[in-house]
Structure formats: structure tokens, C-alpha cells
């Protein structure tokens, strides 16, 4: 049987062929056009209804569900637990790749690699000006309030510093224009100090003066000495380009300016919490969310034994571990567990030995490597001590970059040298392992993080 199907003519989603309506017994051409227009309107309304329904489904089952899950976790916590947002450098890396036309180079290099060849030369100009940003940075954004009127601020939760600072209404630099500003005149609990101070970070400097006021984190409030920042020019362009207002330091007192106790220690000093410790839990399934708990340990965030490693430094959350990758070994290496690093940083010599014969591609001018996601040669990191063994498989240090090319991954491993061989165990490590930062016992606790709560 010969069945012929007539293909209708569509333009911009609307039916325009009159033959579509030939089956209707209508003689009046004006009525025919009215009906045709009615069908077009009906089509638009139907399309809008479907799209609205789809949007609502995504909102209800993805965004809202994630918020509900977070609220449920916070509500059922035994200790002060706050949710925070995670922003890392991967988007900036991909933007740089596209802006400077490295995408084709990477794809071509992969094709060479698949053919058993190696592409060693970058074909661009040696004068190509690529803006080098700090690709290893990652930012954990948490919210807190200052003043008895609870002026809201978004803070970087930084284990590498120990002071708390907020931008002041007295700030005159451009970076403060888009920030929440602290106004001491609106708080009845404000105490004047006025001591001038300058804070230095890897990304730059800020300056201002000390003040004291009520600081609220979650449901806990305490009088606390902090810095009102009035000049952020030395912190540009980082400050203007980021969404945080200030920094909440979670490091050690000896790192602080003005010999101020870290806020977690001060909470214990004022009998607000039982233990001077905090923990980080980063869900594997959600790269943009994390949980900070202060004063105690939420056992539902981890499974198996919780192993403690003693600190070997009085400034940093630094421990001693033996590092193994295949037959490459570095005994008694310093390992800093850091909430502000998006990668695993490795001594350069160690990294170069590790990458030999692994079929990876160095991206020109940028401190990272690309490979095929299914590369079976990629090794597992092993960090060991007398107390425990901590492994990091490729699935944890690989970052998919499908928009550069199908099946491509970036290694979240960066070569970085210190005077003494040191590893920084950043985001990849902290996603596999639940971490405890214990001031009281001067140690870091490590346990396997639960994948599903």
C-alpha cells in the first residue's frame, strides 16, 4: 500500500501553508484566514504552556529541591551548621581558553595524541597576551551579620587567614560601590577602636581600622574585634570581580593582625560552643554547595573512622604525610589542608616525574594539563602516616571540560614550589574527605565523606 505523507510548511514555528486547512469545508476565504490565525494563536499558547510547565518542573524538582535538602540538613543539625556557596576558577579557565583561541590547539593536540604522536609546539604568537589569574583559587562564600541590627555580609571562609573584615561606609574606593557596607552609626553595640591596620593577601592588600561590634554567625552572636576596610584598591581586580563583601578568617591567632583570637576560638572563650573546632563537608553531587559546622562534629557527614593528624606548624593547618604516586615517593612531606585551593598542588619536580608517559597535554601559558577522561594511565595519589592512609583516585582530580571537546578532562593538579616540599590538599581532597579543623587539639581530622545524606 502506498501511503503518502504531506510535509507541512512551517516558518518560525507557525503553520503557513493553506493546504493544511484543505480538509475543512469553508468557502469564505476571510473565515479561513481567521481560523488559520486562531490555530496560530492556539499553537503559541500551547507552546508557552509547555515551556512554563517545563520551567516549573525544573524549579520544583531541581532548584527548590536542592534548597529544601539544604534547609533540612541545617534544621536537623546538632551543632551550628551553615550552608555556603562554592565558586572556583574553572569557569575563568574555560573563558581564557576560548578568549585566546586555545580550544583548537587543545583539540588538535588530542588528535595527535590519539594517533600516537605528540604535538610539542604552540602555533600562536610568542607575544600572545594572556591574562594570568590565580587559577588555583577557590572561594567558599558564607553569610554572617554585624551589629545589633544584623547588617548582612557575604564572607570568604578562609583557613589561610585569621582576621574578620568588612567594607565600611567610610570606604571611598571604587571596589566598595557594589558591596554591603558596615555602618557603625546604626548599631547600638558598636565600640570604637580606630587602630589603623593593613591586611596582606596573595591577591593584594586592604586597609582600614579596628572596630568592635556584635557578630552573628548562624544563631550564635558575640562581641568581636574586626576590621572596617576603607581602601580596597590594593585588592583589585579580585575584589570588584567577586561577589564577597569581606573575609572571615579560620586560621590561627599567630596569623592575625592585632593578635585577635579566631572567631571560632573566641566563641569557645565566651562559652558559646563546647569545642573550638569547625568542619567542612562538600557534597560530591553538588559542586556549588558546602556545609560549615562550628563547635562540634556532625557524624552524618562521614562514614568509617575519623583519623586525626597532628599539626606540624603553628600558623597553618599543616600536617606531615608520606606522598606516593606509583613508584614516586616523597617522605614526610608537608601537607596543608586548605579551603581556598581548587586543586591539589604538588612540588614541580614531583609533578614532572608523575606526568611522564601519562598522555597528558600542557596548555600553553596556563598551569594545568588536559587529557582524555578515560585515560587508564592516570595514577592514584596515596598519602600515608602512622595513623591512616588517604587515597585520591583520578575521578576526584579530573574536571570535565566537554565544552572544549568531547571526552576531555582537566587535571586539577598544579605544580607549586615552597622552600620545603609541600602539597596543598584543596577541593579535590576535601570532596572525598570530611575534614575537621581542631584548635583545641591542634590537629586535622580526616574521614571518608558520605556521598549521600
Swiss-Prot record:
<dbReference type="GO" id="GO:0031910">
    <property type="term" value="C:cytostome"/>
</dbReference>
<feature type="domain" description="Peptidase A1">
    <location>
        <begin position="140"/>
        <end position="447"/>
    </location>
</feature>
<comment type="similarity">
    <text>Belongs to the peptidase A1 family.</text>
</comment>
<feature type="active site">
    <location>
        <position position="338"/>
    </location>
</feature>
<dbReference type="InterPro" id="IPR033121">
    <property type="entry name" value="PEPTIDASE_A1"/>
</dbReference>
<keyword id="KW-0472">Membrane</keyword>
<keyword id="KW-0378">Hydrolase</keyword>
<keyword id="KW-0735">Signal-anchor</keyword>
<feature type="disulfide bond">
    <location>
        <begin position="171"/>
        <end position="176"/>
    </location>
</feature>
<feature type="topological domain" description="Lumenal">
    <location>
        <begin position="59"/>
        <end position="453"/>
    </location>
</feature>
<dbReference type="GO" id="GO:0005764">
    <property type="term" value="C:lysosome"/>
</dbReference>
<dbReference type="GO" id="GO:0004190">
    <property type="term" value="F:aspartic-type endopeptidase activity"/>
</dbReference>
<keyword id="KW-0812">Transmembrane</keyword>
<feature type="propeptide">
    <location>
        <begin position="1"/>
        <end position="124"/>
    </location>
</feature>
<dbReference type="InterPro" id="IPR021109">
    <property type="entry name" value="Peptidase_aspartic_dom_sf"/>
</dbReference>
<feature type="active site">
    <location>
        <position position="158"/>
    </location>
</feature>
<feature type="transmembrane region" description="Helical; Signal-anchor for type II membrane protein">
    <location>
        <begin position="38"/>
        <end position="58"/>
    </location>
</feature>
<dbReference type="GO" id="GO:0005775">
    <property type="term" value="C:vacuolar lumen"/>
</dbReference>
<keyword id="KW-0926">Vacuole</keyword>
<protein>
    <recommendedName>
        <fullName>Plasmepsin II</fullName>
        <ecNumber>3.4.23.39</ecNumber>
    </recommendedName>
</protein>
<comment type="subunit">
    <text>Component of the hemozoin formation complex (HFC) composed of falcipains FP2A and/or FP2B, plasmepsins PMII, PMIII/HAP and PMIV, heme detoxifying protein HDP and falcilysin FLN. The HFC complex is involved in hemoglobin degradation and detoxification of heme in the food vacuole during the asexual blood stage.</text>
</comment>
<feature type="disulfide bond">
    <location>
        <begin position="373"/>
        <end position="409"/>
    </location>
</feature>
<dbReference type="GO" id="GO:0020020">
    <property type="term" value="C:food vacuole"/>
</dbReference>
<keyword id="KW-1133">Transmembrane helix</keyword>
<dbReference type="InterPro" id="IPR001969">
    <property type="entry name" value="Aspartic_peptidase_AS"/>
</dbReference>
<feature type="topological domain" description="Cytoplasmic">
    <location>
        <begin position="1"/>
        <end position="37"/>
    </location>
</feature>
<dbReference type="GO" id="GO:0042540">
    <property type="term" value="P:hemoglobin catabolic process"/>
</dbReference>
<dbReference type="InterPro" id="IPR001461">
    <property type="entry name" value="Aspartic_peptidase_A1"/>
</dbReference>
<keyword id="KW-0064">Aspartyl protease</keyword>
<dbReference type="GO" id="GO:0005774">
    <property type="term" value="C:vacuolar membrane"/>
</dbReference>
<dbReference type="GO" id="GO:0006508">
    <property type="term" value="P:proteolysis"/>
</dbReference>
<keyword id="KW-0645">Protease</keyword>
<dbReference type="InterPro" id="IPR034164">
    <property type="entry name" value="Pepsin-like_dom"/>
</dbReference>
<comment type="function">
    <text>During the asexual blood stage, participates in initial cleavage of native host hemoglobin (Hb) resulting in Hb denaturation. May cleave preferentially denatured hemoglobin that has been cleaved by PMI. Digestion of host Hb is an essential step which provides the parasite with amino acids for protein synthesis, and regulates osmolarity.</text>
</comment>
<dbReference type="Pfam" id="PF00026">
    <property type="entry name" value="Asp"/>
</dbReference>
<keyword id="KW-1015">Disulfide bond</keyword>
